């Protein structure tokens, strides 16, 4: 039976569905995000449907020191975290130098630094107990550079690389690390990143559901997989096709997908 999981970015999308799926397995939860009302709604739904306990911690992890503040609050609960799911993250459409620098830096704070900090702090606790599982929600975006989302693609490349290295370092100590790299998923991400009018965003109707992606990633984590891409077609593309294409062609293709017609 699963034990307590800490899930960041749990107020919507993949994080929301991951929390429900973990609860369906009988595990308690600590969930965090900025939107307290959404967290309370999720807590109520889960505790109504499952015999588990849910602790909410409303917090903005995109500010400096957010991860340390979260860790302190988690420790104060007295709960031992057996599963860490680093899901919180956001993107942003536009030419890098035309976007607000503050937003780009916040993206790095949340998508990269928070992942590193929580992995370090909670991973250390897991090693001491001799067991633990981590799921880092990355993206197929991490397999290529991403013009018009330069920072977002780079942060996901970091997460995918980092997760694999952590798995190699900690697996013999009883701790595994899985990078979930989905393609397009029907969540709030596209609206928040102002991608809804792009060629990519216009294909949202064909995207995977957050529920199916969450279940796929969670199951991959429990199986100790290293990298999990939620569709075979995406996996084949990023692993076997894209690396063979000329670099500038790939850049032009991605720029076209992320442009507004």
List PLM regions with ranges:
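Substrate-binding pocket helix/loop in short-chain dehydrogenase/reductase
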Residues: 95-108
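Active-site helix of classical SDR
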Residues: 119, 155
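Conserved glycine-rich cofactor-binding loop
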Residues: 11-13
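Residue(s) in the substrate-gating loop at a strand-loop-helix junction
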Residues: 139
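Conserved glycine-rich Rossmann-like NAD(P)H-binding loop of the short-chain dehydrogenase/reductase
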Residues: 25-41
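SDR active-site lid
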Residues: 169-234
């Amino acid at each position: 039976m699963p034990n307590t999981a800490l899930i960041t970015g749990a107020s919507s999308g993949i994080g929301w569905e991951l929390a429900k799926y973990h609860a369906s397995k009988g595990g308690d939860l600590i969930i965090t995000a900025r939107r307290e009302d959404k967290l309370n709604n999720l807590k109520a739904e889960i505790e109504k449907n499952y015999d588990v306990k849910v602790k909410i911690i409303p917090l903005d992890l995109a500010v400096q020191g957010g991860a340390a503040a979260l860790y302190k609050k988690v420790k104060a609960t007295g709960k031992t975290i057996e599963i860490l799911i680093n899901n919180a993250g956001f993107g942003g459409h536009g030419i890098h130098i035309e976007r607000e620098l503050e937003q780009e830096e916040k993206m790095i704070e949340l998508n990269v630094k928070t992942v590193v900090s929580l992995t370090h702090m909670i991973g250390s606790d897991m090693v001491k107990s001799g067991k633990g599982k981590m799921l880092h929600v990355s993206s197929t975006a991490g397999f290529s550079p991403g013009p018009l989302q330069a920072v977002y693609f780079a942060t996901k490349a970091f997460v995918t690389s980092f997760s694999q290295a952590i798995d190699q370092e900690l697996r013999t100590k009883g701790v595994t690390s899985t990078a979930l790299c989905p393609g397009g998923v029907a969540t709030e991400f596209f609206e928040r990143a102002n991608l809804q009018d792009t060629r990519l965003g216009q294909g949202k109707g064909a995207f995977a559901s957050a529920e199916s992606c969450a279940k796929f990633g969670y199951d991959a984590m429990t199986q100790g997989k290293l990298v999990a891409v939620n569709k075979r077609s995406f996996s084949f593309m990023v692993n076997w096709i894209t690396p063979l294409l000329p670099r500038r062609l790939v850049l032009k293709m991605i720029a076209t997908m992320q442009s507004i017609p």
